């Protein structure tokens, strides 16, 4: 007998598409003064986390990056974390 026929058959895994956390009726607004919200989208080293990880839409990712850069310029967020 062949060994391949005794192995269990795996079903393909269907990953559910994440929705953008900034779209919807009661979604938070992206504001450069809201440091607590912006820190959720910055890595522990201070880099902006990509949208493929955070599931933020392309339009909102650009707004988020602009708000983070503005907050960095004003000294509300660090550029790098040592």
From Swiss-Prot:
| Highest taxon above the source species | Bacteria
PROSITE patterns associated with the record: RIBOSOMAL_S18 (PS00057)
GO terms assigned for molecular function: small ribosomal subunit rRNA binding; structural constituent of ribosome
Does the keyword section mention Transcription regulation?
no
Q: Where is this region: Disordered?
A: 1-20
The family assignment reads: Belongs to the bacterial ribosomal protein bS18 family.
**Which PANTHER family does the UniProt record give?**
30S RIBOSOMAL PROTEIN S18, SMALL RIBOSOMAL SUBUNIT PROTEIN BS18M
Give the protein name, as stated in the record. Answer: Small ribosomal subunit protein bS18
């Amino acid at each position: 007998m062949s060994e391949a026929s005794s192995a269990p058959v795996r079903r393909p895994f269907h990953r559910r598409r994440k929705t953008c956390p900034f779209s919807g009726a009661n979604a938070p607004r992206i504001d450069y003064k809201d440091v607590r919200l912006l820190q959720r989208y910055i890595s522990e080293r201070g880099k902006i986390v990509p949208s493929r990880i955070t599931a933020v839409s392309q339009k909102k990712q650009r707004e988020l990056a602009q708000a983070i850069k503005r907050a960095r310029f004003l000294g509300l967020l660090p550029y790098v974390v040592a």
